[in-house]
């Protein structure tokens, strides 16, 4: 039906139907009047398909029933329906929006499953992050706190409070600072080997400590933080510890923040700094980063450009100093002599270049010798940002070029040639006062430090640019894709998002943003405090105001389809054609089947599906149902939250909701008769109907009548006689009395022969073995064995023993052969009754001289044993060839083969496991314990030299994994005492996300060792000396006392003579200074002359006001220029003053 008015007054039905039928469309006829009916019937067919489906609580009618609704608030409904008609009319601005190409974004909710978060009650400003991959931990410095977190999920390993003392805070506030400023903000955090060096503002009293990397609560050393950490937490600073252990810090070193310096301390070299109060060296700098590279220490900063003649502008700089610099002599004492700085150029090329002057962050990529920098426009100008990359070779080229020098304050800055164009921190070869000085002239070092040429980036255009956004932090990762190596940039913004971009020379991918990560909840905007990258774990660590986040660098598993995986253009991810999933190159099953498509920048999908807005308020309406009428409630909604955009789908679901309409119940048609309850014999059938056509609701009448009918069935179908098995008969007699026989029994099928199953059943019986019965064979006739020349002979006869169980006659076995031998004399006097055959043989042997009886040859060698173990046999044979029987001679008598037992030892046994024992009780009641069970290799045990059992002899299983009260596991046992006399124990948090009420406190504890556990090392002779104690008597004691008295007397005399000698020297030195009045402290009046003056000491000041190195007790200058005027007022004399009061005195009493 076209969208318009229908002249027919017939009402339509609310009927669900297939998409291609007219019944699918929800059409409402309004019977308030002809014009009203036509109006609504013209509007409703034009609803979106989702609004024409009868779903949910909407009233559904079928059949010829007609429905008519009266809406007092019809204008409200028509307005909602008409607004849904405007979805298809897209304004021109929306068409332009659909044509834009924007980079993809990852919403906070979509990123949360991949992110690990750490917060701590009361901790703020998580600005300092230091990675310790060897300890698998992240060191975090926050306001008043230090933390050790796990690199895997930033879970808490240790929390240590490092707050300022109450006196320090009160002193800070008395100087006009706020309570927020008068806290301890960590501003230096460096992991150096097994120590962590950290500095904090300490309520405007900077302090530094060195702590154990595995136990932050243990302080190894405390030193002054001045010139190493700023006073004010808002001042930028940076620091690096060189490979020689020297600290290079760039910060302001005074309370007011007007004395910036690049300062070296804590090493073997002398402390050095930049020139004090010299704006040409440093002009209101903001320090960004510091790196130890080769022979130099590099510092990246931004400052007011002193060489800019017109107005005030900010330039980005790179400065460097030689690590072997020892300062000057007489000129530039305690000051860098190798300090140089050059401008960093990051701009858009053109006839009038557009400069990004302010450096915000830097990242050193040592594998490529690259320095990436984040640059922005001035804070008061239009926001714009860029990322530029610089080669170290380009930086060195700028420092090897000419300098820029200003002769006087009114002169221009002009280029001047570099006296040492390839300066590499060389030193002077001469000895003496200039020993260890660099080869650079001190006069040049004092006036030539600004380079004339700027450091140019790798590419003329910035790697990445972005308007209307200010970048704040940057880290870079190297990713090996299938075809090339990519530099992936992670850029932090001041709004709290992280941009993931590509740095590549390809024009199609230049300035390509892969995605933007929203790490903060919607509506929250704050700059990132810190950004660190761990390449080995492919993870980002983000420092925020209230916590730390761990964000993975890749989320390949988030792309479910091949199109999404390849369309992301992510160098980390590719489609594995074999496994049919998105994975990294390392996780792919076959590199040849792993594909990527990084040919263009990814584009955000701006298509948006429509969504319904809120329902309008319920309005009463009436309906007509035949001769009766009732009331309903109706409401409507529009597809405008949001509207479909850029080809998105329309809203799915109904646009009109009709509910609470009163209905009288009506019966449905009777169902078909069910099957008869029996297959034979009398049964019954059932049919039903329900009061649901329609069901009564909202006050409607219920149906009148029965909902169930029954009737008899199968009255004339008798059941057949049942066929069944009779009982089993008795078991028959066993077929064998022993050795295992069989028994059977039978049953019969009653009323037929078609019973299911077998009619015969068998079972075994008499399984015990039968007794063995032996039988001997009769003796054989006597047979001659040896016949002598005289006619005497030996004869033998044989018989055999047979044995077999009666139940198995086929198992007959032959026993050992028994042999009897007798000797028969030649005269026949013996009782040798021979057989006729034997006599014939004997007579024939005596009558025929040519008859030769057989003789045995020698035995052959023994054969190999038939078995390797458990009693086998071996055999040897002989032949009747010595001689062979001839002319009717007798054959050889005896056996041609002889058997012998061999290898009676038992066979080797391979070991086998015994059964597992029962599980032991759980080792802990909470916090995670374990069961244990064991088995042994004794079933059987292996014989010596044979294979042992393979596998584990002990198994363990987890138990009692529920968390202990308050989330902590039980404390471990105290460890053994260390060399420092301390013990420690630890526990771990069982809660996945510990909150304020769970896992409070430290995860480790330490204590001094009890005296009973501290090992005491005694001399080797102590035992021997103990045996001689009984020989020490009173005589020995007296002799010892006298010896000690004499020794102390001699020592006292020596000390006294030494003091007298020193005092004489002191009197002589006093005469060097005449006793003239000290005009600075002249008291005047009538006091005695020797009481009118007080002692004073004058010293020359350090020219640069350097802070002495607290740890090495190193002072840069020898205090040679010291002048002293000394007077001794009565009643004291000159000997009452300690010699330390005067540096000129070098003799000290032995006191």
From Swiss-Prot:
* Domain of life, source organism: Eukaryota
Outline which residue ranges sit on the Extracellular face: 1-1036
Where in or outside the cell it occurs: the entry states: Membrane
CDD domains registered for this protein in UniProt: Sema_5B
What is the protein named? Semaphorin-5B
Q: Transmembrane residues, as ranges?
A: 1037-1057
Q: Which residues are glycosylated?
A: 153, 236, 345, 436, 788
Q: Which family does it belong to?
A: Belongs to the semaphorin family.
What is the recorded membrane topology of this protein?
A: Single-pass type III membrane protein
List this protein's GO terms for biological process: axon extension; axon guidance; detection of light stimulus involved in visual perception; neural crest cell migration; positive regulation of cell migration; semaphorin-plexin signaling pathway
PSI domain segment(s)? 555-602
Q: Name one GO molecular function term.
A: semaphorin receptor binding
Show which residues sit on the Cytoplasmic side of the membrane. Answer: 1058-1151
Q: What does this protein do?
A: May act as a positive axonal guidance cue.
Where is the organism placed in the taxonomic lineage, from the top?
Eukaryota, Metazoa, Chordata, Craniata, Vertebrata
Q: Which Pfam families match?
A: PSI, Sema, TSP1_2, TSP_1
Where does this protein chiefly localize? membrane
Organism, by scientific name, is Homo sapiens
Q: Which GO terms describe its cellular component?
A: plasma membrane
Q: Which residues form the Sema domain?
A: 103-553
Keywords of this protein's UniProt record, alphabetized?
A: Developmental protein, Differentiation, Disulfide bond, Glycoprotein, Membrane, Neurogenesis, Repeat, Signal-anchor, Transmembrane, Transmembrane helix
